[in-house]
Design a protein with these regions (language model features):
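AAA+/P-loop NTPase substrate/partner-engagement loops
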Residues: 38-58
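Conserved P-loop NTPase motor cores
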Residues: 11-35, 48-52, 62-173
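Extreme N-terminal starter segment of soluble prokaryotic enzymes
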Residues: 9-11, 41
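Conserved GTP-binding G-domain of TRAFAC-class P-loop NTPases and closely related GTPase folds
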Residues: 136-219
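Pre-Walker A adenine-sensing motif
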Residues: 1-7
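A structural signal for isolated positions on well-ordered beta-strands in alpha/beta enzyme cores
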Residues: 44, 122-124, 189
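Short, flexible N-terminal segments of the mature chain
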Residues: 61-66, 70, 208-216
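Short helix-terminating capping/connector loops at secondary-structure junctions
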Residues: 37-40, 83-84, 183
Length: 219
């Protein structure tokens, strides 16, 4: 089934996959196709190490959009967000940053629990492991409205665990959908957990395909 469903602003997005799986490319396409609606007016990209893909982002033609790159997370980022502006904050490669997960101040978890609503914010967190063992990561995953999963040959249990949580009566459905979506190189599965999304449109892939997104529904 093919449909067209944009990512809605404000929202919380979690993207998980190993190095080189295509996570950053997903964000490039998300911006390039303006697949967030309404589209952000300010984008703050927090990174650990500079990547060539960032040069492509700076070259994107995004009229009236301010793009800022910041090396490493700091608490001032949250306070700089004007609620009268449509903000997007991308947190890339910040899992090992102690400041990003501090108990005090504006940790990443705060972006997911308060920022989206109070700061007119779409926050995107890019990680390698969906089930990283930390209290903050659990809070982030529970408050993610969109989850984008890439294939991780070394950790097949994360999708099985998620399948049991979301579809306890049919856990194999999510696993089968994920296997189909990721059988091609750089394939991914989008899990849409926004409350207004119809149940039949929650699991999908190929979200930037001009012919429409592919949707998976339980049999």
């Amino acid at each position: 089934m093919s449909v067209v469903l944009p990512f809605k602003h404000p929202s919380t997005i979690l993207i998980a996959g190993p190095t080189g799986s295509g996570k950053t490319e997903f964000l490039v396409r998300l911006l390039q196709t303006r697949s967030v609606q309404p589209f952000p007016q300010r984008i703050v990209w927090v990174y650990g190490e500079w990547q060539n893909a960032y040069d492509r982002i700076l070259q994107l033609r995004l009229p009236s959009v301010k793009i800022q790159f910041v090396k490493d997370f700091n608490e001032e980022i949250y306070d700089s967000l004007d609620r009268n502006t449509r903000n997007m904050v991308v947190l890339d490669d910040q899992m090992e940053n102690e400041n990003a997960h501090s108990k005090g101040g504006s940790s990443i978890a705060k972006f997911f629990t308060q920022g989206s609503h109070h700061r007119n914010l779409t926050v995107v967190y890019i990680v390698q492991n969906l089930f990283h063992q930390s209290k903050a990561m659990r809070t982030i995953s529970l408050n993610s409205q969109y989850v984008v999963l890439y294939k991780n040959p070394r950790d097949k249990q994360q999708i099985e665990c998620l399948g049991r949580q979301m579809f306890p009566n049919n856990p194999r459905f999510l696993t089968a959908s994920f296997e189909d979506a990721t059988k091609k190189p750089y394939g991914y599965l989008v899990i849409d957990l926004r409350p207004e999304t119809p149940e039949s449109y929650r699991i999908r892939t190929d979200v930037f395909d001009s012919n429409g997104q592919t949707v998976y529904v339980p049999k």
